[in-house]
Amino acid sequence: MGQWIELTASDGFRLAAYRADPAGPDKPRGGLVVVQEIFGVNSHIRAVCDGFAADGYVTIAPALFDRYERSVDIGYTPDDIARGRELKARAKIGRAHV
């Protein structure tokens, strides 16, 4: 099970990220960055991070929408998809913001 941490972007902006670490004394196999979908760092993305951690990888999923709306965690209904698309448009994903 992972935990929420705080990251600082190059411009000083602070954003949340979900971090999952491997259990046990063994050295991690590596590190991974999991990029959220339009639904934010929701339960699915956290489960993906936890799964990679179970396989030995330190995994971080930054909350990329935090600049526009904090703690985005939405589901998969048609209304959720519309909201996610709106957030993506506001965030202008594709430009370097994080």
At which residue positions do the language-model features occur?
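N-terminal cap/leader regions of alpha/beta-hydrolase-fold enzymes
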Residues: 1-95
